[in-house]
């Protein structure tokens, strides 16, 4: 095409020779051994108890990630040293939620077994996927601590609606896949949960940190206080980020938005801090609904959560 120097690929954006975007560093997985972080999408939203277009989120988060600069001023270099592979999306059954959860577990378990050095960056999807992702992590890695950023406990009973985006941690605790004392819930909000589910979480010794508690003590000090306690009892840490932990002004594209949540910068700093810890097994982002979003604000915030996780991993003295 040298004969037509001003003709370019349809839809292509402005290209600055001095800027490296994440799109320049993200590549389709070639089937080779995976070492370190790599992306995988889980486009499930049928299990949401409210209207949800979270199945579209892996695509919009990817786009927001690709449009971001790869350069971190804090690092003084790109946030990834080599290519960041994208494994694609896990196939979701058209109508069967239970079968979809099995697809997720089976795929994650097989990949983690075959690639023990893989650190999954999971793009949900509604929060129901956490049952399958964390189950796969726990069965392949060992005793796992879960840091759950969420406005809700997500321990609803399964009798009233089956496996939904409100039940993943109930199922994980009931089936003893994780222990309550190894689950840290950060950002639990007022008027977003029931007394029965708070009682269930407390009965199982879940580490609950409400927004009121976080506002009084600070998010990072809270994490610094509780994290060593669970690290001493577990082999790995998994980070689960429900984007509705953010205040509705920061994340309008969530099915269950509400006031009084975390600010984006607080979440980013917290994820970066946790990602610097030893034996981080991965991170998932759930409950982004692009159909409700404004100018992709929530997908952009989710992409920055991933970027700060990558930055934390690169800053880690344990890598």
UniProtKB/Swiss-Prot annotation:
Chain residues that bind Mn(2+) 1: 127, 150, 154, 242
Catalytic reaction list: N-formimidoyl-L-glutamate + H2O = formamide + L-glutamate
InterPro entries given in the database record: HutG (IPR005923), Ureohydrolase (IPR006035), Ureohydrolase_dom_sf (IPR023696), Ureohydrolase_Mn_BS (IPR020855)
Sample GO molecular function, one term: agmatinase activity
Cofactor(s) listed: Mn(2+)
Residue numbers binding Mn(2+) 2: 150, 152, 242, 244
Assigned EC number: 3.5.3.8
The keyword Amino-acid biosynthesis appears for this protein: no
A single GO BP: putrescine biosynthetic process from arginine, via agmatine
pH dependence: Optimum pH is 8.7.
Pathway: Amino-acid degradation; L-histidine degradation into L-glutamate; L-glutamate from N-formimidoyl-L-glutamate (hydrolase route): step 1/1
Family matches, as Pfam families: Arginase
Keywords: Histidine metabolism, Hydrolase, Manganese, Metal-binding
Keyword Metal-binding: yes
Record's cofactor remark: Binds 2 manganese ions per subunit. Can also use other divalent cation, with lower efficiency.
Function: Catalyzes the conversion of N-formimidoyl-L-glutamate to L-glutamate and formamide.
NCBIfam families given in the database record: hutG (TIGR01227)
Family the UniProt entry places it in: Belongs to the arginase family.
Protein name: Formimidoylglutamase
Species of the source: Bacillus subtilis (strain 168)
């Amino acid at each position: 095409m040298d004969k037509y120097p001003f003709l370019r690929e349809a839809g292509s954006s402005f290209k600055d020779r001095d800027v490296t975007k994440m799109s320049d560093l993200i590549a389709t997985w070639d089937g080779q051994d995976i070492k370190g972080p790599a992306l995988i999408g889980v486009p499930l939203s049928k299990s949401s108890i409210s209207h949800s277009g979270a199945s579209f989120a892996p695509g919009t988060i990817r786009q927001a990630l690709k449009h971001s600069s790869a350069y971190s001023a804090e690092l003084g270099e790109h946030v990834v040293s080599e290519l960041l592979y994208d494994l694609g999306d896990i196939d979701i059954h058209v109508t069967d939620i239970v079968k979809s959860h099995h697809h997720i577990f089976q795929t994650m378990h097989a990949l983690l077994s075959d690639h023990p050095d893989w650190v999954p960056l999971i793009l949900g999807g509604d929060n129901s996927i956490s049952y399958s992702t964390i189950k796969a992590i726990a069965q392949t890695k060992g005793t796992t601590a879960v840091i759950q950023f969420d406005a809700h406990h997500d321990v609803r009973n399964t009798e009233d609606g089956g496996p939904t985006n409100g039940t993943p941690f109930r199922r994980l605790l009931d089936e003893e896949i994780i222990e309550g004392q190894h689950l840290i819930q950060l950002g639990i909000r007022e008027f977003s949960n029931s007394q029965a589910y708070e009682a269930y979480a407390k009965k199982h010794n879940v580490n609950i940190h409400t927004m009121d508690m976080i506002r009084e003590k600070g998010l990072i000090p809270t994490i610094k206080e509780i994290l060593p306690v669970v690290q001493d009892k577990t082999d790995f840490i998994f980070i689960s980020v429900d984007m509705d932990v953010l205040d509705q002004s920061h994340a309008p594209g969530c099915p269950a938005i509400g006031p009084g949540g975390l600010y984006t910068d607080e979440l980013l700093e917290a994820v970066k801090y946790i990602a610097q810890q030893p034996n981080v097994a991965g991170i998932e982002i759930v409950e982004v609904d692009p159909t409700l979003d404004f100018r992709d604000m929530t997908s952009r915030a989710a992409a920055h959560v991933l970027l700060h996780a990558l930055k934390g991993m690169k800053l880690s003295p344990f890598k």
